Amino acid sequence: MSKTTTALYELIWWSFTLVLASLLLLPIFTKLPDFPFYLDNFAFVVVAITLTRYLFFLDISWLRDHLIIQASASILLIILIFWMIQSFNGFITFFDEEGPDILVKHLDKDTAGIMNTYMKTQYRFFGIWAIMAALLTPPRFLYNVWVRYRAGVRQI
């Protein structure tokens, strides 16, 4: 695969990821401006999609032959996993301490129920997906490093 094709492929995926993350957060942003977990939620969506992409499409990505970067990313993902678990726990603890409807009490009853369900479901779905993808990616990277090194790839 040529470098131009690889760069275009990467650009398209990043564009898709950022647009999807923005669209998923748009209902929360418009109805709940005081939502304290925007950054965490955005990071969960981006991490989930990006790491899942690398899990399944590593063989056709720019990262395939960059063994040192994969090994470094595997180590850095451990730190990211701890941060994501802490953020996820903070989200659950926030609603345990403040009450289940603290952020939607200013909305009418029907809209509040819908937004409360959407907000919690979306955050939990992408949070768990991101954590699982981050747990599976280091072994995938290390396996790829081993296979590519045995194939004679010695790039940084």
Language model features with spans:
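Hydrophobic alpha-helical transmembrane segments
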Residues: 111-138
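Juxtamembrane non-transmembrane "cap" segments at the membrane-aqueous interface
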Residues: 85-108
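Canonical alpha-helical transmembrane segments
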Residues: 43-69
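Cytosolic juxtamembrane helix at the C-terminal end of the final transmembrane segment
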Residues: 134-156
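Transmembrane alpha-helical insertion/packing segments
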Residues: 1-51
